């Protein structure tokens, strides 16, 4: 590892292996190690939720804050699984039953204060550093939960640190009523459309977008999409005004964890024999007998993910010999629709409602194809897992899906570079046609194996992404 050439404070609401509700945690957890290889030292600041309280016994207090939006707080430092972590211990904000963002009755009513506190501490560390003399050159805030961080740095001082805001999913914007402006320690004179005001209220994400020195999103295509009304979700104008400071950088995946070579029945691009063994085990787990391609769906079951399209396109796919194994949870009507397909097509469709990390690994190892029909997808990790395991991705042409999959059209097949199948628009006819192409490809074993091997050789690790972030940091601190 190179000697650290810079210091970065990552401010986020979740991070593996401490806590995960979605892909954000994977990214935040992967960046420190990936950036270390580029010579950057990253520390991660996140809230100390109730399930993490026990870790405080192994950590040291860095500093305290007497009045942290309604009560005292303290920052605790320690190392977790090789990551230098800073946990914000503020019991009045984080020590409660339920998830990090919501309780049994919905979103926590004080989420604005809870995550303003996280941002406030991030900005304080930028200004004052830590007790050991560590002070960041760059503060990297993630999504709405850390969106106020660049704003606080602007209004209360940054200590010379630069700020980056990464938009992982613009659908979540951190809205709060304007009446909280002063309580959130934001200057009233900045409550106007060019700054903090957002449709009569506040948005922590908008505050970050107008305040950060640079904005990143999690794929180049998503960076462009966010400037269009159908994807920007009300913030397209804000982002378009800052187009010169917006960069799309694809996420990567942890290739040590997500690797067919470390599974129970290992295989690689040079020897695919054990993939058939995994397929047999997967078929047994879901009680399936599928003569054609066995597709998998590992996803949140939501409209955004295009799950409502599955019942419309699946009958023809089944009739042509295909099958489907589903793992996911989400909207009740879509969960019910998946169960109905299982009843309608016994032995050809299997469904597990919920999430099981071990089962998901088996599904990628045994699946012939993975379906990702998202209406929008900022980056997407599922298709990258598919590439890694030779489960050929069938994806909608949007966001990170468009940036990671090379469509198996005649030109790409002739050039020997195809890695999957894409379709556009995200509607049943186009999706159904992509599945027909999948059936046709599967019927040609040589062509199928070529695409499989191409997919498995496609780089999906963090090396390229980390280099891009490191280049951005260097530019900001130059």
Swiss-Prot record:
- Kindly list the positions annotated as binding ADP-alpha-D-glucose: 20
Keywords carried by this UniProt record: Glycogen biosynthesis, Glycosyltransferase, Transferase
Please identify the protein, giving its name as recorded. Glycogen synthase
Keyword Transferase belongs to the record: yes
Q: Which GO terms describe its cellular component?
A: cytosol
Functional note: Synthesizes alpha-1,4-glucan chains using ADP-glucose.
- A GO molecular-function descriptor: alpha-1,4-glucan glucosyltransferase (ADP-glucose donor) activity
Query: What's a Pfam family this protein contains?
Result: Glyco_trans_1_4
Pathway the protein contributes to: Glycan biosynthesis; glycogen biosynthesis
Listed PANTHER family = ALPHA AMYLASE DOMAIN-CONTAINING PROTEIN, GRANULE-BOUND STARCH SYNTHASE 1, CHLOROPLASTIC/AMYLOPLASTIC
Q: Which family does it belong to?
A: Belongs to the glycosyltransferase 1 family. Bacterial/plant glycogen synthase subfamily.
* Gene (name only): glgA
Q: What EC number(s) does this enzyme carry?
A: 2.4.1.21
**What cystine pairs are annotated?**
none
Single biological process term from Gene Ontology:
glycogen biosynthetic process
- Asked if the keyword Transferase belongs to this entry, the reply reads yes
What reaction does this enzyme carry out catalytically? Answer: [(1->4)-alpha-D-glucosyl](n) + ADP-alpha-D-glucose = [(1->4)-alpha-D-glucosyl](n+1) + ADP + H(+)
Q: Which Gene3D superfamilies match?
A: Glycogen Phosphorylase B
Organism field: Cereibacter sphaeroides (strain ATCC 17023 / DSM 158 / JCM 6121 / CCUG 31486 / LMG 2827 / NBRC 12203 / NCIMB 8253 / ATH 2.4.1.) (Rhodobacter sphaeroides)
